[in-house]
UniProtKB/Swiss-Prot annotation:
HAMAP family found in the cross-reference section: SSI
Pfam families named in the record: SSI (PF00720)
Its job: Strongly inhibits the kexin (KEX2) protease. Also active on subtilisin but not thermolysin, trypsin, or chymotrypsin.
SUPFAM superfamilies: Subtilisin inhibitor (SSF55399)
Quaternary structure note: Homodimer.
Signal peptide coordinates: 1-25
Protein name: Kexstatin-1
Lineage: Bacteria, Bacillati, Actinomycetota, Actinomycetes, Kitasatosporales
Annotated localization: Secreted
Family: Belongs to the protease inhibitor I16 (SSI) family.
Keyword annotations of the record: Disulfide bond, Protease inhibitor, Secreted, Serine protease inhibitor, Signal
Annotated propeptide span(s): 26-35
Amino acid sequence: MRYITGAVALGAALVLGTLATTAQAAAPAQPARTGGLYAPTELVLTVGQGESRATATVQRAVTLSCMPGARGSHPNPLGACTQLRAVAGDFNAITAATSDRLCTKEWNPLVVTADGVWQGKRVSYSYTFANRCEMNIDSDTVFNF
């Protein structure tokens, strides 16, 4: 009788083990996590009063995301993303723009910064303008907030 009970228990264990293995094999596999279709573009832009990034007091900060669509707390995300795409994300090209407008020669420095990721590449940029007038001329849309 002991042998029969042991054989039945062993048989039941084998059947249940086989069913559990089969059930696990039949379960659908979880899809592999893949990245998005677009390289990430997420930026934090700031404007601060001061002569350098290290000493400036941040007055305003906004977020800007350009992929897959323009969005963020920037007042004109579409315009800012369009301006950045036109220069392939080169912030120097934006801040070095020229204009026919004239500004006073006062020294009241403003520092603009951009930190984050532009089309998958890390960005850490800062530029010091002599005054607000020069900043508004040169930075057209991206730092105009």
